[in-house]
């Protein structure tokens, strides 16, 4: 029986995943397989290596200065700006609200593109160097936990799935960066002459990859209010979780936002594994005997 955890992409919302994963470790939840896309791939690699200290450290210190050199403020840029889901998610909005939202997102994107072209590309050197300091190929390869990621080949836009055994030695970090290369916010990654961009352009939540790797039971950490793969909800062998509230923009590295999301992920893990209860709020497990006795007295 192999148990997997699947981690979605979402940029700075990865703090939510970090909180979830740290809580899962506290609860002694064991996983034989970890798969992830984008920030989920980066968080997942640390879990596969057993480096929970590195995971916690990353989300304690991460801010915009640890991601880019001299980048504009992209706090409110939505992770679905470049997809039609922007329109789908706002079907309930009136036309003026929709226009305002699109105008705001366009303005943010234009601000970034000015920075991008002025500097001949986005300089994400701080983020790359931080990841390099954490990545240990031998530790990942020798781990009993199998690991896989999703990235996308460019310009074919074809999904590319890689397990750790399929990644060329010396390029494991490159594949992690490729999976999280949310172009054009992040530059493309080139590996052996092939260009790759963020796996979220194809599969932002690689559940099928976990199944292909032999998972019998799967825990899913989806960071979207609207599930990425609703077809997997309520499956007997899949525990599928989504956040109870919107986690904000995918480039929001404000400390308060990161701490909030990390706490939300932490509480979600405790609820998913049956230690806490609630949806919008969190409660200790209810004592059904107390409720039974109370209502019995009312009826007598």
Predicted regions and their residues:
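Patatin-like phospholipase
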Residues: 1-37, 45-300
């Amino acid at each position: 029986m192999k148990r997997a955890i699947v981690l979605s992409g979402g940029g700075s919302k990865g703090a939510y995943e970090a909180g979830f994963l740290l809580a899962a470790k506290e609860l002694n939840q064991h996983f034989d397989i970890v798969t992830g896309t984008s920030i989920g791939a980066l968080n997942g690699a640390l879990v596969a290596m057993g480096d929970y200290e590195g995971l916690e450290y990353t989300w304690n210190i991460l801010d915009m200065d640890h991601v880019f050199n001299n980048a504009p403020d992209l706090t409110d840029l939505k992770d679905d700006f470049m997809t039609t889901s922007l329109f789908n998610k706002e079907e309930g909005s009136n036309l003026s609200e929709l226009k305002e939202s699109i105008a705001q997102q366009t303005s943010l994107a234009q601000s970034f593109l000015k920075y991008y072209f002025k500097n001949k590309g986005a300089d994400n050197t701080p983020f790359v160097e931080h990841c390099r300091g954490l990545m240990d190929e031998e530790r990942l390869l020798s781990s009993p936990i199998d690991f896989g990621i999703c990235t996308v080949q460019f310009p074919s836009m074809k999904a590319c799935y890689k397990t750790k055994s399929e990644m060329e030695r010396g390029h494991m970090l490159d594949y992690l960066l490729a999976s999280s290369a949310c172009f054009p916010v992040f530059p493309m990654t080139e590996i052996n002459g092939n260009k790759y961009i963020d796996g979220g352009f194809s599969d932002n939540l690689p559940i099928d990859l976990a199944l292909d790797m032999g998972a019998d039971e799967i825990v899913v950490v989806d960071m979207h209010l609207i599930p990425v793969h609703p077809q997997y909800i309520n499956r007997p062998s899949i525990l599928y979780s989504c956040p109870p509230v919107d986690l904000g923009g995918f480039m929001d590295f404000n400390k308060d936002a990161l701490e909030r999301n990390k706490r939300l992920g932490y509480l979600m893990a405790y609820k998913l594994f049956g230690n806490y209860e609630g949806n919008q709020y969190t409660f200790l497990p209810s004592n059904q005997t107390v409720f039974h006795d109370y209502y019995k007295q009312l009826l007598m």
